[in-house]
Amino acid sequence: MISLLGKMRKQMNGAVADAMFYYGENYGLNYGVSLPTVREIALTERHDHALAEYLFKQQVRELKLAAFHIADPTLINASNSALWANGITNSELAEEAAFALLRHSPAVMEIVAEWLRSESEWVVYAAMMAAARSNATSTAEIESVVDIVSRYPDSRPIAQGCVAMLAAAYLNVEFQSVVKSTIETLNNCAATDYIREEMSWRMEF
């Protein structure tokens, strides 16, 4: 961990940290290392799941993000994913979890199904982004959007996650009708307005 932290600190950029935007909780410590650089450094490390879990528990932005790349995706499943879910406290962590870890897991569909029921906005967001990136979508996941929107009617990240998941599902002809019917049954709210606007042009092509 010390070596990895040293590499991150060499790339420290206070201006980037100050300008950084994400939804959710702030980090305990943020060196302001750009996300592409965090990924580049993390990918020089071999998979070490125990180390990744340790890094993810640290209150340092760059170590948390790197942990998603160092973890072994074959070792995460619905029954042991709580450590990761509990540590996802903002939109940046949710997006990187989906991109770097969840979508590569053989158990991604089971994890997505579990996380969509979470009481954490960010865990739900991560699940939807993982579903979109890995095509881990079934009718159940699509229809869950109705409940999710009712729980988070004013959340822009949740609305964006819904669009990502619905748009990915709509590419499959088998799911097009259920996507349309799901959108039609959403309660009127800010999240629904965003979803309908974004999906309207996507469903035209």
Feature-to-residue mapping (PLM):
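Alpha-helical scaffold domains
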Residues: M1-F205
